[in-house]
From Swiss-Prot:
Its main location: membrane. It is a lipid-anchor. This is Tremerogen A-13. It comes from Tremella mesenterica. Keywords: Cell membrane, Lipoprotein, Membrane, Pheromone, Prenylation. GO terms for cellular component: plasma membrane. The record marks C13 as: Not methylated. It comes from the Eukaryota. The lineage of its organism: Eukaryota, Fungi, Dikarya, Basidiomycota, Agaricomycotina. A lipid is attached at C13 (S-farnesyl cysteine). It is found in: Cell membrane. One of its GO terms (molecular function) is pheromone activity. The keyword Membrane applies.
Length: 13
């Protein structure tokens, strides 16, 4: 996980 993986998956690993 890197960014906003809750509402917006911007960087979900």
């Amino acid at each position: 996980e890197g960014g906003g993986n809750r509402g917006d998956p911007s960087g979900v690993c």
